[in-house]
C-alpha cells in the first residue's frame, strides 16, 4: 500500500491489503475463480469477493465472461486488467533509439526504432521525446495513460546534478542538467520517469525474459561501441554507492595514460571495445570496417581473424576474472554487438579463466540480442507502474500530478 494510503491497522488499511493480495495473485499466477483465489491467498471467500468487487470498480480486474467446468454452479473467472495502465521503455544507443510501449502484462502494443543522428544533447532529448510521443500515439493511447517510463542510456545517470557521467559516445550527453531536461520532456502527462544505465537494464532484461531466468547472481557483460557491465545480486540490480558499479571501461589495462583526457573513454574500453577489435585486425593486414567483419572472417576460418578474436576473449576474461574475484557470479551473459559472438568468445574465455580463478562461471550468449536493454526498461517500468496504478486507484487523473 502506498505512502498516501489508509492508516495502518484501520479497516480501510485491511481492505487495501486484501485488494493488493488478490491483485498480486492474479498478476503472478493468471486468471482464477473466487474459490481458487481464496485457496491460494488464505483469505475467506467473502473477503475475496469484496476485494474483487472493489478492484473491478477501480478498473484493475475484470471478469473474463468465462466459467470453469465442474459440478455445481459455474464460477466467474477473473483476471488482472492489462490495460489499467501502460509503460514505456527507451533504449538510447549510439546509432539507434528504440522505444516500446507495453501494457501491465508486459505485452508490447507499439514499437518504434529511430536512427540516432543527433549531434547535441538538446537534439537527442527532442528526438527521444518525439519518438516516445509517436509510439504512444501509435498504440492508440493518450499521454496520461502511460504510468511509468524507463530510459536506458550509456554512462552513469546522476539525478542530483542532472548529469550523465561517462557517456563519451553520445555528443554532448555529459552536459550538466541534460538528465533534468530529458525527464521533464518525458513526464509532461504525469508519467513516472527513471533513467538507468543501459548495461544494468540489459542484465534486468536477460534476468526477466532471457538467458538468466532464475539466476540470482549474474553479470551481464556488454561489448560493442563501448563496454559495460550490469550486476544482479540476490536477483536485484546492484548499482553500488554512487551508481557506478559495473563501469568497467575504467578498469586498468595496459600502460595507464595520464593527462586531461586519460579517462576518455577509459583503458578497458580502449583495449576491448569495437574499435579495438577493428584496429587489431587491420594491424594484421585484414580489411575490416567493423568488428562484425572480423568475427565473420573468423567464422570463415581466417587465421588472423581467429587470432584477433582469441585476443579479445583474453581481454574479456581479464574483466570477468576481476569481477568474479569479488562477486563470484553463477553466470556471465555476453551482450552487445561483440558480446553476441559468444560462440567464438566463450571457449577461449573459459580457458583463460581456468588458469586464473578457482571457479569459472558459466558463460552464455544473451538471448534478447539488441532488445535486451528495451526488455529491461519495460520490466523495470512494470514494477513501478503496477504499484502506482494500485496506489492511485479511484483517484481522478490530473496531468502532471
Residue ranges and their predicted role:
Residues 87-91, 146-150, 218-222, 228-230:
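Short glycine-aspartate micro-motif
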Residues 111-113, 119-124, 170-199, 204-304:
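Glycine/GP-enriched mid-protein hinge/lid loop-to-helix segment characteristic of carbohydrate kinases
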Residues 156-159, 200-203, 228-229, 238, ...:
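Short, active-site-adjacent cap segments at secondary-structure transitions
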Residues 147-148, 192-197, 362:
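Proline-centered loop/turn at the N-terminus of a beta-strand
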Residues 103, 159, 232:
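Short, acidic, Ser/Thr-enriched surface-loop or helix-capping motifs
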Residues 137, 141-175, 331, 335-336:
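Short beta-strand-loop/turn "lid" adjacent to the catalytic site in phosphate-handling enzymes
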Amino acid at each position: 500500500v502506498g505512502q498516501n494510503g489508509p492508516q495502518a491497522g484501520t479497516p480501510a488499511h485491511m481492505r487495501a491489503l486484501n485488494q493488493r493480495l488478490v491483485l498480486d495473485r492474479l498478476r503472478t499466477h493468471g486468471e482464477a475463480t473466487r474459490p481458487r483465489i481464496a485457496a491460494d491467498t488464505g483469505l475467506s471467500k467473502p473477503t475475496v469477493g469484496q476485494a474483487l468487487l472493489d478492484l473491478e470498480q477501480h478498473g484493475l480486474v475484470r471478469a473474463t465472461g468465462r466459467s470453469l467446468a465442474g459440478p455445481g454452479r459455474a464460477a466467474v473467472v477473473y483476471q488482472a486488467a492489462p490495460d489499467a495502465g501502460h509503460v514505456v521503455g527507451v533504449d538510447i544507443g549510439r546509432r539507434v533509439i528504440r522505444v516500446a510501449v507495453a501494457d501491465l502484462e508486459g505485452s508490447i502494443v507499439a514499437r518504434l526504432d529511430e536512427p540516432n543522428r543527433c549531434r547535441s544533447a538538446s537534439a537527442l532529448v527532442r528526438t527521444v521525446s518525439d519518438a516516445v510521443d509517436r509510439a504512444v500515439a501509435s498504440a492508440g493511447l493518450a499521454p496520461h495513460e502511460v504510468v511509468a517510463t524507463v530510459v536506458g542510456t550509456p554512462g552513469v545517470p546522476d539525478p542530483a546534478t542532472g548529469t550523465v557521467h561517462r557517456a563519451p559516445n553520445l555528443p554532448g550527453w555529459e552536459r550538466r542538467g541534460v538528465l533534468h531536461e530529458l525527464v521533464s520532456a518525458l513526464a509532461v502527462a504525469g508519467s513516472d520517469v527513471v533513467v538507468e544505465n543501459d548495461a544494468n537494464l540489459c542484465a534486468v532484461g536477460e534476468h526477466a525474459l532471457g538467458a538468466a531466468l532464475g539466476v540470482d547472481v549474474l553479470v551481464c557483460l556488454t561489448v560493442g561501441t563501448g563496454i559495460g557491465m550490469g550486476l544482479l545480486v540476490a536477483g536485484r540490480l546492484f548499482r553500488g554507492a554512487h551508481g557506478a558499479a559495473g563501469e568497467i571501461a575504467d578498469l586498468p589495462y595496459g600502460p595507464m595514460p595520464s593527462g586531461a583526457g586519460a579517462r576518455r573513454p577509459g583503458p578497458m574500453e580502449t583495449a576491448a571495445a569495437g574499435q579495438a577489435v577493428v584496429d587489431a585486425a587491420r594491424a594484421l593486414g585484414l580489411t575490416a570496417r567493423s568488428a562484425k567483419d572480423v568475427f565473420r572472417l573468423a567464422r570463415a576460418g581466417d587465421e588472423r581473424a581467429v587470432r584477433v578474436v582469441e585476443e579479445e576473449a583474453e581481454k574479456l576474461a581479464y574483466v570477468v576474472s576481476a569481477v568474479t574475484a569479488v562477486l563470484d557470479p553463477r553466470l556471465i551473459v555476453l551482450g552487445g554487438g561483440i558480446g553476441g559472438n559468444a560462440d567464438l568468445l566463450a571457449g577461449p574465455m573459459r580457458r583463460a579463466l581456468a588458469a586464473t580463478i578457482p571457479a569459472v562461471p558459466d558463460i552464455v550468449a544473451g538471448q534478447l540480442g539488441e532488445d535486451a536493454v528495451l526488455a529491461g526498461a519495460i520490466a523495470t517500468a512494470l514494477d513501478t507502474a503496477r504499484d502506482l496504478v494500485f496506489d492511485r486507484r479511484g483517484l481522478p487523473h490530473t496531468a502532471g500530478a
